[in-house]
Amino acid sequence: ANPRPQMIGNLEAGDLIVLDLFAESRPQWGDPASTWYRKDGFGQHDWIYCMLLNYGGNVGLHGKLKHVIDEFYKAKESPFGKTLKGVGMTMEGSENNPVMFELLTELPWCPQRFDKDQWLREYTVARYGKSNPTVQDAWILLSNSIYNCPDANTQQGTHESVFCARPTEHPYQVSSWSEMKDYYDPNDVIRAAAMMVSVADEFKGNNNFEYDLVDIVRQAIAEKGRLTEKVVEAAFAAGDKKLYKDASDRFLRLILLQDELLATRPEFKVGTWIARARSLGGTPEEKELYEWNARVQITTWGNRLAADEGGLRDYAHREWNGILKDFYYMRWKTWFDYQTRLLDGKKTAAIDFYAIEEPW
C-alpha cells in the first residue's frame, strides 16, 4: 500500500495494484488538496480507493459521509480515474460504523455521484425494512454532525469517549496519537439519539435497528460524559468542593449507565471478546494465554515500557460493557478520590495508573 514512486516507477502497467490506504483523509492518488499529495499519483498503475476509518478497533460513531462520496467521484472523474479499479477497506478494527462500509461498497455500482441525504433515506429503509421519517431525520442529523468529519481532519478514527481516558487534569483524547478535534455539536448526537428512542417501539425485535439504537444512545451518553467532565475540571480549578463532588458523582453514574446499556448487546460486551479469544485455545494453558492477550490488547498493550513510555496504553480501548464497570470506572474513581484529597489540602502521592491497570 502507498509505495514510494521509486519502487514502482520502472514496473510495467498491470504488474501490480496499489492500495491508497487512507484515501478518505490523506489520499495519494493525485489529489492536490491532500497533505500527502503525489503529483503523479501511482503513475500508470492500477489502484484502489481505500477507507481506513478506524484505528485500534475503538468504539464510536465516526466518518466523512459526504466527503467519501465527493472524493471518490473526484478521483473517478480526474485523469487518474482511468486506473481506479475499485474500493477497499483498510480499517484496523471492524464491526463498527456499518453505515460507512455500506456507503463505500456501494460507490463502484453508482456511475454518477449522488445526494447523501437521499442515499441515507434509502439506506434506512433497506437496513430496517420500512420507511420512517423520524429515523431518516435522525440519520441526516448524524450525517451533518458526527458523520461529517471535516475533509482536512486526519484524526485517527472516532471522537474518543472520555470514559475510556486515563484520567488527568485535562483529559481529551484517549489514545496517544488520535489527533481528534471537536468538529461537531454533541447536542446534535444527543438529539438524534432521542429521535431514535422516540420510535423504538415501532422497531421492536428489529435486530439492525436495535443495534443502531444502542450504538447511537451509547454515543449520546459518551457526549454527556464529556460535557460533565468539563464541569468537573472547572469545579476543581475553582476549588468548589460541592460542585466537584456532584459533578464527579454524576460522571461515575454515567459510566455505570453506559455499562448497563451496552450489556443489552453481545457486540458491546467485553465478555464476548474474551470468550472468542479463549475459544481459539486448544489447551487450558492456551486459553489462559489468549485471554491474557485479549485483555492486554485493549488496555495496557503490554508492559510498563509499552504502556507508559511507548504511549501504547489505551490504543485499542473499547467502550464496552464489563470493562467500563471493572476498569474505566476504577480509574476514574481513583482519580476523583485523589483530587478530593487535594481539595481538602491533604498530601497525597501521585497515582501509578499502570499498577492499578495491569492486574485487570
Language-model-derived ranges and their functions:
Residues A1-S143, N148-P150, Q156, C164-P186, ...:
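Catalytic-core regions of glycoside hydrolase
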Residues W139-S143, A193-M196, R218-I221, G225-E229, ...:
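Short amphipathic alpha-helical coiled-coil/interface segments
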Residues V162-R166, F209-A234, D249-L252, A275:
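Amphipathic alpha-helical protein-interaction segments enriched in hydrophobic
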Residues E179-D201, D215-A237:
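C-terminal substrate/ligand-recognition segments
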Residues V197-S198, K204, R218, E233, ...:
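C-terminal amphipathic alpha-helical "assembly" element
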Residues A200-L213, L261-A277:
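Short, solvent-exposed, charged loop/turn and helix-capping segments
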Residues W320-W360:
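Extended, compositionally biased alpha-helical segments that mediate assembly or anchoring
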